[in-house]
């Protein structure tokens, strides 16, 4: 299958904002994809090469890409860089450079999707001495044979800036439409495996029956079950039917641990493979998780003086560290608090009631300094739960989780079977969709960021406020560098930004407001932290903001 066909799909997707049209375009394309490409193409449509949980990365920056294009076309690097300043779009500028190509390869052949993908794999797997030169050579060979439109989208895929507006929801619906299968079965299979390539292949070759048989696989992360908020311990008990399992809500990073013999893989909440950054936890899992094969979930907490928990950002620092890891083990010790088990030695436990899963977890784990079971209290008495809550806060934890005793594990679902109880209104995780250039000494920096939540009815991110406080100059420099490649449009000082970056925002209250299409606005929003552990799909939704608004009004009424 020619790559030009995929490039044509990208073009059509870029030209429409309608979700229904995008879904139809993707569905029509998938119908014609040969079986051997079914596991590759869904990721390319999303503007990716590999699933999020795959360790491989292309490791190519803008400068290396420009060099590769210059070698392929004979157009000087400086000319390409000046063109980028004029167009504001690296992909467009690379297409222009390919148009001016000064040498034509005598042996040039049309690019195929397989050749482009195989080249991306070679680029990702080039490591060690001379790897940058090899990456450049592989890409230059692609650009030599690429047409301008193909070059534009190859460049965007390499840099992860596709801008077609296709996210997981559109791809899910397109798979269902293309192969006449139920969208809910596609969703379920994806939530269990986090692998659109595998799900697409099953949908086409095995239909609804095959999708309904999809099971958890060790080595492929399961989408995490999520919780809603409760206003109080009493409200949580009432919602749970009078009895609940209360667990400490740790201020850490949620992880999913996959064990297959001596092979241990640990995924972050965002499904990124963080195994290499936390070797001491890997070793502890090998020795303390008894089953031969298992999938367990827990909260990774950074431990400070006297065993007190440190803010979750310390855990993220561990995740980011690629070198001198031994030093970081000493500086930021970690503790894994396990709270669930999803799979044990060939048996999926997602449909098993929660208390039975807890029993299986206790049987599976040998506790130590590194690995512990989440502290739990099962009770019908509000006063016992209140005392447990008070102790959790005194120890420096965030609050409590309340869980229905009979609840099954629902991957990717945020329902009322799990509830969070915290003493203050919860911060929001929002996506940056716009920004303004600063003034004076900050004129070269982006600031005053427009933040948005996802509106499931509209199928798009809608703004809920502007965040301009809480940033240091270093923060603004980092955000400017991060967001510049994601700028879609500029109008005066304002820039529209592709929704890719998630930040944690605190605020005084949520207000009803006609100012934004969402109907909500944050009062006095303030930046707290970059949420590298969350993808845009995991950010808070308008539905969630509406739920928090209702909780807020109930708090006010009780005063």
UniProtKB/Swiss-Prot annotation:
The active site is at residue 249. It comes from the Archaea. Pfam families: DNA_ligase_A_C, DNA_ligase_A_M, DNA_ligase_A_N. ATP binds at residues 247, 254, 269, 299, 339, 414, 420. The keyword Cytoplasm does not apply. One of its GO terms (molecular function) is metal ion binding. GO terms for biological process: cell division; DNA biosynthetic process; DNA recombination; DNA repair; lagging strand elongation. Belongs to the ATP-dependent DNA ligase family. This is DNA ligase. The gene is lig.
């Amino acid at each position: 299958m020619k790559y030009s066909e995929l490039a044509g799909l990208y073009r059509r997707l870029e030209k429409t904002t309608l979700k229904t049209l995008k879904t139809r375009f993707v569905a029509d394309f998938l119908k014609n994809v040969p079986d051997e490409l079914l596991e590759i193409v869904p990721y390319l449509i999303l503007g990716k090469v590999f699933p999020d949980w795959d360790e491989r990365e292309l490791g190519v920056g803008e400068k290396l890409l420009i060099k590769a294009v210059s070698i392929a076309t004979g157009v000087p690097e400086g000319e390409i860089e000046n063109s980028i300043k004029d167009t504001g779009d690296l992909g467009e500028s690379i297409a222009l450079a390919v148009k001016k190509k000064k040498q034509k390869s005598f042996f040039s052949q049309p690019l195929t999707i397989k050749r482009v993908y195989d080249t991306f794999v070679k680029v990702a797997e080039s490591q060690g001495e001379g790897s940058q030169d090899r990456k450049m050579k592989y890409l230059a060979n692609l650009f030599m044979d690429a047409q301008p439109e193909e070059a534009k989208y190859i460049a965007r895929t390499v840099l992860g800036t596709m801008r077609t507006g296709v996210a997981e929801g559109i791809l899910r619906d397109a798979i269902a439409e293309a192969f006449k299968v139920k969208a809910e079965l596609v969703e379920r299979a994806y939530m269990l495996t986090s692998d659109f390539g595998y799900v697409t292949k099953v949908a086409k070759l095995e239909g609804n029956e095959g999708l309904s048989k999809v099971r958890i696989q060790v080595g492929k992360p399961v989408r995490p079950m999520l919780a809603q908020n409760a206003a109080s311990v009493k409200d949580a008990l009432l919602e749970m039917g009078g009895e609940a399992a209360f667990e400490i809500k740790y201020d850490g990073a949620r992880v999913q641990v996959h064990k297959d013999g001596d092979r241990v893989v640990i995924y972050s909440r965002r499904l990124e493979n963080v195994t290499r950054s936390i070797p001491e936890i890997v070793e502890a899992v090998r020795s303390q998780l008894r089953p031969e094969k298992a999938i367990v979930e827990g909260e990774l907490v950074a431990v400070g003086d006297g065993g007190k928990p440190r803010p979750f950002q310390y855990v993220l620092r561990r995740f980011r560290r690629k070198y001198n890891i031994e030093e970081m083990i000493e500086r930021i010790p970690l503790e894994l608090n396990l709270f669930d088990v999803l799979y044990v030695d060939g048996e999926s436990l997602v449909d098993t009631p929660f208390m039975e899963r807890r029993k299986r977890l206790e049987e599976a784990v040998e506790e130590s300094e590194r690995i512990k079971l989440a502290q739990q209290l099962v009770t019908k008495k509000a006063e016992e739960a209140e005392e447990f809550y008070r102790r959790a806060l005194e120890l420096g934890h965030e609050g409590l989780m309340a869980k229905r005793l009979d609840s099954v594990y629902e991957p990717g679902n945020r329902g009322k079977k799990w509830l969070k109880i915290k003493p203050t209104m919860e911060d929001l995780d929002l996506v940056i969709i716009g920004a303004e250039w600063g003034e004076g000494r900050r004129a070269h920096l982006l600031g005053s960021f427009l933040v948005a939540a996802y509106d499931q009815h509209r199928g798009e991110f809608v703004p809920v406020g502007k965040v301009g406080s809480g940033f240091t100059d270093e923060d603004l420099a980092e955000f400017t560098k991060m967001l510049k490649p994601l700028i879609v449009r500029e109008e005066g000082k304002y820039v529209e930004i592709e929704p890719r970056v998630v930040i944690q925002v605190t605020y005084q209250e949520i207000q009803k407001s006609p100012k934004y299409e969402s109907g909500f606005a944050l009062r006095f929003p303030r930046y707290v932290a970059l949420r590298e552990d969350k993808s845009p799909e995991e950010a808070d939704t308008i539905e969630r903001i509406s739920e928090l608004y209702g909780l807020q009004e109930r708090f006010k009424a009780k005063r």
